[in-house]
A protein has these predicted regions:
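Low-complexity, Gly/Ser/Thr/Pro-rich intrinsically disordered linker/tail segments
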Residues: 743-747
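Alpha-helical transmembrane segments of multi-pass membrane proteins
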Residues: 1-742, 757-768
């Protein structure tokens, strides 16, 4: 019997945690591969999980065995049928900067009912076992260990076993088969309960992410549970939950939005909860103070040095973020564990924990995108995390000398940090210029000067949560204030698809003794467009689209093939810089998923590439691939070049690089046309994938990787190194590309499995 219940709860947890990345991955193509998809999914699943706990509590307390046997099992069967009926999400009816409501609707249709029922399984199975009359039924908490093991299996099996080997349709079929098996196991579990059992004082109602150790090893004394205590529980659960989503979004926005970068933070979060409830939580809280301060210092440096992240190794970025999440999660969950009530109040305790977790999802997934122009929720939760440190009660210190020292730390350090930031902000630039070092070294020294003293102060204040919180808030607030008041930032906005900003920069042209100003469009940490502001230079294409770069050379080759005019279909608008290459006889249609990007590119107060275009230019809003499919189905006129340049910050929307996508591009091409793909990426090597996709479609494959060494040093601010690949089925077009002198025939550096709409594996594309 024990093994039966262990397997049942193990199966339920495995299903619970494997369905989340599976459904989220199926939604990525519908919403442009945005990293916000997973944040919204977590919000939805945390909320449904809370509803599942409420349902389980109601069933165990109010529903008879007979009704459970037929009513609950009947609902499970309905959920299984619903899982088969709603198997594919639908795209939003129109482009939107905030499609969260539509995404939540799709989540509810595709997986809402099955997830709701499986989320109630943990407490229900434990409750059923408590009513079996087994010798261990008085203490069913050992089943939490099986639940936690199943959670890890479900989480880690998906990116390492399931995703690399199974397509989405196969994944869904296997999951629904597992759900069907769980229904049978649940039916048997209810049959094993004693007849007439309705309510048992030993039956727990907790969450899946609950203690795997001895729950009675150290609950807090049975103090009255007032609203202050409930608010503490909520806060202790809120901080790790918000940190989980912040770290996940931070990673997936600049690498790629894919399951491994979703489940690793979630696995760390789960592990911190298991350890916190299994260990001596009071001792754990004390031992975590210094590590937590050190981790937060590292995260603060990352926040303040956002540009440094662009050049940091991916492993270092992931390691620092996961370490921070682990320490903060362990602290928050240890605080929860040390304050947990006696067993008679566990139902309320776990319910409030789940409310705190859901609030973290609401804050990161809904509130922050609506009220913040940047990812302010990340530094905010950093400050909240410091508040988890024990607050020193200065009033209870009897020694006058120690009391004065405590006040000096709490008040003096924040004030000193504030004064230091003001002084350095005023004189640091003059100091590094006086040192006479290179521009790169100036940036490093300047950052070190500004961050050094506040970092030391944060560490000195580690023993007082209030002091540490105030000291941490100073450099973060100063950085945010400088960013908000920077006169060179002309636009800042946040949409479902990322953070956008329009920034002015300049350099001095020594040859003509003139100040040259240029404007950049930033998407996260990635530059998505550059334009000179000097009137005589606004028509010059810059950035990745410089006339002497790979994109410029490919367009020049097409002009020679199509002297009477060419039609361009371009997925990804940016600032519209490619328009500067066009002749009056050409025409361009852009496909852009983010309406805010279109607003920026079309508004001449920001960029004038579109408003000053010499040829007809149009912008269609929506996912580029879906719009191309609609054009194909409607039989619209084809293009001479389909250019794919759609980034989500520095990540690639996977659905634009599948074999079905390549076929679609060819369907929209005229004879002799070119598919041009921009594959520059800091972390992913997409060349082998694109080469194999091209060969699979009987294409000539060409590639040009322009290194930084090929660009004049004085032009690096507005001419960027980039990697482009070109596919064509025409030998004449291929020869024209090769004759341009830059593109070379592509070759496969190693073999990778081709991506399809049902299968993709980002792990295979990481830089080797």
């Amino acid at each position: 019997m024990v093994l039966y219940f262990i397997f049942t709860v193990f199966l339920s947890a495995t299903l619970l945690f494997s369905v989340q990345p599976m459904v989220a991955k199926s939604l990525l193509p519908v919403f442009g591969g945005s990293s916000s998809v997973w944040t919204t999914c977590m919000l939805f699943y945390q909320t449904v999980l809370l509803l599942g706990y409420l349902y389980a509590h109601f069933v165990m307390k109010r529903v008879s065995r007979r009704v459970q046997l037929f009513g609950h099992i009947g609902m499970l069967v309905i959920a299984l049928v619903a899982g088969y009926m709603f198997d594919s999400p639908s795209p939003p009816p129109s482009a939107s900067t905030f499609p969260v409501p539509w995404l939540i609707l799709q989540l509810a249709l595709v997986s809402g009912l099955p997830f709701f029922m499986i989320s109630s399984a943990g407490p229900l199975v434990q409750g059923w076992f408590a009513r079996t009359g087994h010798t261990r039924s008085n203490d069913p908490y050992f089943l939490y260990a099986a639940s936690n093991a199943g959670s890890f299996v479900g989480l880690l099996a998906y990116p390492f076993v399931i995703e690399p080997n199974l397509g989405l349709a196969e994944q869904r079929s296997f999951w629904l088969a597992g759900f069907g098996l769980f229904i049978l196991m649940s039916f048997g579990a209810i049959l094993m309960t004693k007849k007439g059992s309705h309510e048992d004082p030993h039956a727990p109602s907790g969450e899946v992410l609950a203690p795997s150790g001895d729950v009675d090893s150290g609950p807090a004394e049975d103090r009255p549970i007032d609203w202050r205590r409930r608010l503490r529980w909520t806060f202790y659960a809120f901080v790790p939950s918000s940190m989980l989503l912040g770290v996940t979004s931070h990673l997936s926005m600049d690498i790629a939005s894919f399951p491994l970068l979703w489940v690793l933070p979630l696995a760390v979060y789960l592990l911190t909860m298991i350890v916190a409830f299994a260990a001596d939580s009071n001792r754990l809280v004390k031992s975590l103070r210094r590590p937590m301060v050190i981790a937060i210092i590292g995260a603060t440096i990352l926040v303040l040095a956002s540009e440094a992240q662009a050049y940091a190794p991916i492993k270092a970025l992931v390691a620092v973020q996961l370490l921070l999440l682990g320490v903060v999660g362990l602290m928050g969950h240890s605080m929860l564990s040390s304050d947990r009530p006696s067993a008679s109040h566990l139902t309320e305790f776990y319910l409030i924990m789940s409310i705190g977790g859901a609030l973290g999802g609401v804050f990161n997934g809904v509130v922050a995108p609506l009220i913040f122009e940047t990812t302010l929720e990340y530094p905010i939760v950093l400050v909240c995390a410091v508040a988890l440190l024990p607050w020193r009660k200065i009033g209870e210190i009897e020694d006058p000398k120690l009391k004065r020292q405590a006040w000096m730390i709490r008040i003096g350090l924040p004030l000193l940090s504030l004064v230091y930031m003001q002084v350095m902000g005023r004189f640091s630039v003059s100091l590094v210029e006086w040192l006479g070092i290179s521009l790169v070294d100036q940036t490093i020294v300047l950052f070190a000067i500004i961050i050094f003293i506040p970092t030391v102060m944060i560490y000195l204040a580690w023993n007082d949560g209030i002091a540490c919180m105030l000291v941490l808030a100073v450099p973060l607030s100063a950085s945010i204030y400088d960013d908000l008041t920077d006169p060179d930032i002309h636009f800042r906005g946040r949409t479902f698809y990322g953070i956008l900003s329009v920034v002015d920069e300049f350099f001095y042209d020594i040859e003509v003794n003139q100040k040259i100003t240029y404007r950049t469009l930033m998407h996260g940490t990635t530059n998505h467009g550059v334009q000179f502001l000097n009137p005589e230079l606004t028509h010059v294409p810059l950035g990745y689209y410089h006339v002497d770069g790979p994109c410029g050379m490919a367009i020049q080759a097409l002009k020679e093939i199509r002297p009477d005019g060419a039609r361009y279909g371009i997925v990804g608008l940016g600032s519209g810089a490619i328009t500067a290459h066009a002749r009056p006889q050409d025409s361009i249609k852009y496909f852009e998923i983010d309406p805010e990007v279109a607003h920026i590119a079309e508004d001449p107060q920001y960029f004038t590439y579109l408003s000053e275009a010499e040829c007809p230019v149009s912008v269609d809003l929506g996912d580029g691939r879906l719009l191309l499919e609609r054009e194909r189905d409607a039989g619209e006129e084809k293009y001479d070049m389909v250019l794919i340049d759609a980034f989500s910050s520095d990540s690639i929307p996977v659905h634009l690089l599948t074999t079905e996508a390549i076929q679609l591009y060819y369907d929209r091409l005229t004879d002799g046309g070119i598919v041009l793909l921009h594959i520059s990426n800091r972390h992913l090597d997409l060349q082998p994938l694109v080469f194999n996709l091209g060969v699979d479609h009987q294409s000539y494959v060409m590639m040009y990787e322009q290194d930084i060494d090929e660009i004049p040093e004085d032009m690096l601010g507005y001419w960027f190194p980039s990697v482009w690949m070109a596919l064509t089925k025409s030998p004449q077009t291929a020869q024209a590309m090769l004759d341009a002198g830059m593109f070379q025939e592509g070759e496969a550096r190693f073999k990778v499995r081709m991506w399809t709409d049902q299968y993709s594996n980002i792990l295979s594309a990481f830089n080797r």
